[in-house]
Curated annotation (Swiss-Prot):
Protein name: FAD synthase
Function: Catalyzes the transfer of the AMP portion of ATP to flavin mononucleotide (FMN) to produce flavin adenine dinucleotide (FAD) coenzyme.
Pathway: Cofactor biosynthesis; FAD biosynthesis; FAD from FMN: step 1/1
EC class name: transferase
Length: 151
């Protein structure tokens, strides 16, 4: 990474679904923020969630974005486009660092190649697990809710 020009803040970008916000999300956002000065989040579009997770999101993208805006580590929030990574949006955000969550299904090297192909120069960093438990997994939280309230 060549780094930002003198005086420019280091901008960190993360993306994700962030459905049923939980402590694991908060720890990830905190760790990502510590990589720079500004933290920008791209929330997955509802169609993207349906395609990738094969289920509807519990909360619509607008609600997930509003919740993320309320977290002190987050400076800006965008809702992504339906489909894959919106490289045009990433280019506009102009991140210095892209932080990948510990359980996000991304190959960092392939992502770096894709970014380069789209003319985006950013360091890609996988954030390690800080808080690993069933309380920090959305699917396990949903399962517990179903078991507790639906059976």
């Amino acid at each position: 990474m060549s780094g930002p020009s003198k005086g420019r803040k280091i901008r960190v970008l993360v993306g994700g679904v962030f459905d049923i916000l939980h402590v694991g999300h908060v720890h990830f956002l905190k760790q990502a923020k510590e990589l720079g000065d500004e933290l920008v989040v791209i929330v997955a579009h509802d169609e993207t969630v349906r395609r990738n997770k094969r289920r509807n999101p519990i909360n619509p993208a607008e609600d997930r974005a509003e919740l993320l805006r309320a977290i002190r580590y987050v400076d800006e929030v965008y809702i992504g486009s339906p489909g894959g990574i919106d490289f045009e949006l990433v280019r506009r955000i102009n991140p210095d660092v892209i932080a990948i969550g510990p359980d996000q299904n991304f190959n960092c090297e392939k992502l770096k190649e894709e970014l380069k192909r789209h003319g985006i120069e950013a360091e890609v960093i996988r954030v390690p697990y800080l808080y690993k438990s069933d309380r920090a997994k959305t699917t396990k939280i949903i399962r517990r809710i179903v078991e507790e309230f639906c059976e």
